[in-house]
Amino acid sequence: AHNLDLCKRNEPLLSAYDVDMKIHTHVLDLPDTLTALLAPLRAHFDEEVAHLQRQGFMPTKEYIGTNDIERAQQSASRAIQQRDMRGYDAARRVADLRRLHILMNLMQTQGTSVAQAFLNRAEEEGRRGRKTNRMLALPVVHQLRLALNDLDELHPKAPLVASLVTQELNAKPEGKVLIFTEYRDSVERLVQLLNTHGSVKADAFIGHSSRGSQKGMTQKQQLAQLNRFRSGEINVLVATSVGEEGLDVPAADLVVLYEPVPSAVRAIQRRGRTARQRAGSVHVLIARNTRDAYVHKASERQEENMHRLMVKLVRQKQLNEAYVVDEDALESFAVQTDTESVEAKVFLEAEILRHGPAAVSYTHLTLPT
C-alpha cells in the first residue's frame, strides 16, 4: 500500500528546506476625493438596477455583481426571443450597467488613470462601431471624464508599490521584484511610475493577445524579457497572469500582488515566485470595502477548503491499493532546482545521508485536526 503525506511549511521534516516567506496584507482606504468621484456613478448604477428589478430582469438583492449582470442579460435575451418588447430596453440598460460596473471596479481597485484609459478605449471602440457611445454619453460618465482630465492619480496603491519597491532595492541592490496585476493598463502605468525612481529598472511582461492599440508580446519577446530579468538588466518585472505558470520566471526577492485573485491556485502560484532558495516577502494590496476585499476572502476560503479536502483524502486513503510501483520507477523522475536537474534516486540518497536517522525513521506525518 502507498501513503499520501500532507505537509505544511512548519512540518519538522521540511525544516531543512524551509525558507522564510513573509506575507504582508495592506488594506488601503480610498481617499475622499476618489469616493466623491464614484458617488454619482454609484447613484446612477443603483437607479438602473432598481428599474431592472421592478421589471423582473434583475434579482432583488443588496449587492449586484458580475454574475447578476450576466443573468440579467440572459433574461433580457429570453424576453426578446419571446417578443416581449421590454427585453430591448432591458438589454440596452444591462449593457450600460456592465460597463459602469467595470468602470467603478477599476476606479476602486486600480486607480483613476486606469479608469481613464478604459474610457478612452471605449471611445475608440465607439468610433469603430462598438455600442459604447451610449454609456459615454451618460451625464455621470461625461462629468467624470471632465474631472479626470484635471486630476493626477488618486489611488493609494501605486505610491505604496513605489515605496515597497524602492525600499527593497535600496536594501538589496542586486534584488529582483515581481509585480502581478490583472490589467495591462495597470502594467503600463506601474512601469512608467517605477522608472521615475533611480534604482528601478522596470519593464512589462504580458500575454500574446492584442486588443485594439494594445499589442501583446510574442513568445520570443517573452523569453527575451525573462532573460533580461534573470541577468539583472531589469530588476522589476510587472506581469499579468501570464507570469503565474508555464514559463520559467526567475525567483524574486519581493512579490507584490496589486490586487487579490479569486483563485486559490493562482494565489499560491504567485506567492511561489519568491522564497525558493532564500528569504522573500509577498505584499498583497487590498482596497477596503471593494471587490478586492471580497476576492481576498474567497481565495482564503478556497485555500482552506483545499487543505481540508487533502486531509480528508489522506485519512480516507483514497489511493489505489492494487497499484504496484516498479522499484526502478524513480529513474523516470528528476528533482529540478534553479541551477540543475538531479536524478530522484541520487537526490533521495543524498538527503537520507544529510538528515541521518531522522529521515529514515520519519514514516508518517501528524495530520492537523
Model-predicted segments: where are they?
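SF2 helicase motor core recognition
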Residues: V238-A251, G272-T274
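Conserved segment of the helicase C-terminal RecA-like domain
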Residues: T274-K297
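Conserved RecA-like helicase motor core of SF1/SF2 enzymes
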Residues: D248-Q269
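Conserved RecA-like helicase motor-core motifs
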Residues: D5, S199-K215
